[in-house]
Regions:
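C-terminal membrane-cytosol helix-exit motif in multi-pass small-molecule transporters
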Residues: 171-189, 380-384
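Cytoplasmic helix-loop-helix junction between adjacent transmembrane helices
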Residues: 105-142
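Helix-to-loop junctions at the C-terminal end of transmembrane segments
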Residues: 62-74, 259-272, 358
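Cytoplasmic membrane-interface "Motif A"-like loop-to-helix N-cap segments
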Residues: 72-82, 269-281
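Juxtamembrane intracellular "pre-TM" segments in multi-pass secondary transporters
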Residues: 2-8, 184-215
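Conserved MFS/SLC helix-loop-helix module at the cytosolic interface between two early adjacent transmembrane helices
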Residues: 61-97
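Short amphipathic helix-loop junctions that connect adjacent transmembrane helices
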Residues: 31-45, 228-244
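C-terminal transmembrane helical hairpin of 12-TM major facilitator-type secondary transporters
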Residues: 274-319
Length: 393
């Protein structure tokens, strides 16, 4: 078992601050956007949905180019560019007088696609054996940002409106840039220049990375589909109102962080990582079946949430760590950009399928369907793990 070195820990915490600030600003909008945007002039459900979803389309389109750019010009300059674009989109949305202006601002926000470059920067500063731990620390910061946003979003929106939330998001993005250059050291110099696009595409479609990219597609599709129905399930079965659902998320996230910390200490090899990924996929199936139980028991909701977020957070740490280990160092940014593209693609499709499932099959039907999809992923993963292990040797 390898412990994090002092530089690895320092860099992990600093980068967590950068990522956490950006994600907190992003999460602030989500709990209240639909309710407030529907009151704007000429608002329709289609336009409200477009305003929410167009961010993900921008992310999908630009993750690979931004990751490739980080391989060529450096991680910190690329992340800075992405954060400036994100801040610009936030300002545009804050100044907008109608939903169309907000849609344009959200589209510009999505073009600041820095997830792949940020994960590549974390990988640059960590040893292979410790990379999952570094990703876990960053994942915890995202989880905390999510819970904090759930707590403060409604009060802030009530006092300052959507314009105030978008303005705060822009300020947080600029603060993240300050953190990036003040606290995060420059990554080690690479001796090999980034490859041409043809080589990058060949690397992205290699079987070992396809298995992992398909996995994150399934994982985030399941997450988004579940969040279409999760708030209603928590109200119905656990008796927790929409404004108070952080009371469930906070202890569940804390407990899942403890589970993650305990397990990741023992995951160092590629083979161990794949065993953990398979186990987490199985746990996701079980958690979705707990949600689908239909018994309207609060303890099943709590158990399902603990299983779901423990497995999800472990996967969030392990999958990108494995991508960074299997990709060539000089194409790491592009590889993690492709990974992030699949992540956002899965989230987009999951939202659509989740809404369809809820409308036509109800809460229990949606979660039964999600469990079936998770089981399909588990089967594919069981067959595909050999591709990862064979090419990792």
């Amino acid at each position: 078992m390898t412990k994090l070195t002092r530089p690895e820990l320092k860099t992990s915490l600093a980068l967590s601050g950068v990522v956490g600030l950006r994600m907190f600003g992003l999460f602030l909008i989500l709990p209240v956007f639909a309710a407030y945007a529907s009151r704007l002039p000429n608002a329709t459900p289609v336009l409200v949905g477009l305003a929410i979803g167009i961010y993900g389309f921008g992310q999908m389109l630009l993750q690979v180019p931004m990751g490739w750019l980080s391989d060529r010009v450096g991680r910190r300059p690329t992340i800075t560019l992405g954060l400036l674009i994100f801040a610009g989109g936030s300002v545009l949305a804050a100044l907008a007088h109608g939903l169309v202006g907000i849609i344009v601002g959200r589209a510009l926000q999505g073009m600041g696609a820095v997830s792949g470059a940020s994960q590549a920067l974390a990988a640059d500063h960590s040893h292979d054996d410790n990379r999952s731990k570094v990703m876990a620390i960053i994942g915890i910061s995202i989880g905390l940002a999510f819970v904090l946003a759930m707590i403060v979003s409604a009060p802030l929106a009530s006092s300052h409106g959507l314009a105030g939330l978008f303005g705060l998001t822009a300020i947080l993005a600029i603060l993240a840039i300050v953190f990036l250059w003040w606290l995060v050291p420059a990554p080690p110099q690479r001796t090999q220049r980034a490859e041409h696009w043809s080589a990058v595409l060949g690397m992205i479609v290699s079987p070992r990375l396809l298995v992992l990219n398909v996995s994150v597609f399934f994982m985030h599709g399941l997450l988004t589909a579940c969040f279409v129905a999760m708030p209603m399930l928590i109200v119905r079965d656990a008796g927790i109102s929409l404004d108070s659902q952080w009371e469930l998320y906070l202890p569940v996230m804390f407990a899942s962080a403890l589970v993650m910390g305990g397990l990741l200490r023992h995951v160092q090899s590629v083979a161990a990582s794949m065993r953990l990924i398979l186990s987490c996929a199985l746990v996701l199936v079980l958690s979705l079946l707990a949600f689908a139980g239909g018994s309207r028991e609060a303890w099943l909701v709590w158990l399902g949430a603990l299983l779901f977020f423990s497995a999800f957070n472990l996967l969030e740490a392990t999958l990108p760590s494995l991508v960074s280990r299997l990709a060539p160092d000089h194409m790491r940014g592009a590889a993690l950009g492709a990974y992030a593209t699949c992540q956002f693609g899965g989230a987009g499709l999951g939202g659509v399928l989740g809404g369809f499932g809820l409308q036509h099959f109800g809460l229990s039907g949606l979660f039964v369907g999600a469990a079936a999809i998770a089981f399909l992923w588990l089967v594919l993963l069981t067959r595909g793990q050999r591709l990862v292990l064979n090419q990792a040797q």
